[in-house]
A protein has these predicted regions:
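Positively charged
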Residues: 1-134
Length: 134
């Protein structure tokens, strides 16, 4: 999906009934794993708050988050990021550590802390959910 107007539209909450979107998103990330480490549902044309990412802290397993919301962050830094929806890289502000509330694939509430590269990936994908393009 490269429609900037669609990508700039904040996504709606995910819920029961979005299981196929989750599967499609995981499959799309798997198919693009050589050039992509995370995706949000709006990148496949679905305006739902669903993200998936490769979690290196879990041996490269794909993690699914529904309705993610970053609740705390620290350690701001400037970086360059790319995106499948855009050409080239762009400068952006990220945080070295984040705390996040989300729901797992079974819609159970979760809270977690992430740091480093994984935290950066999550921030990028949550931005997609919020209609923010780097």
């Amino acid at each position: 999906m490269t429609s900037r107007s669609f990508l700039r539209t904040p996504s709606e909450a995910a819920g029961p009934g979005d299981e196929q979107v989750i599967e499609d998103l995981v499959d799309t990330l798997e198919a693009n794993r050589s050039r992509c480490v995370g995706m949000a549902a709006n990148m496949i044309g679905v305006g739902k708050r669903i993200i998936v990412f490769v979690d290196e802290d879990l041996g490269g397993r794909i993690t699914v988050m529904l309705n993610p919301a970053i609740t705390a962050s620290d350690g701001a830094f400037d970086t360059q990021e790319g995106c499948l929806s855009l050409t080239g890289e762009r400068r952006t502000l990220r945080y070295r550590r984040i705390e996040i509330n989300y729901e797992d694939r079974r819609f159970r509430a979760r809270h977690a802390t992430f740091a480093g590269w994984t935290a950066q990936i999550i921030q990028h994908e949550v931005d997609h959910c919020n209609g923010i393009i780097i």
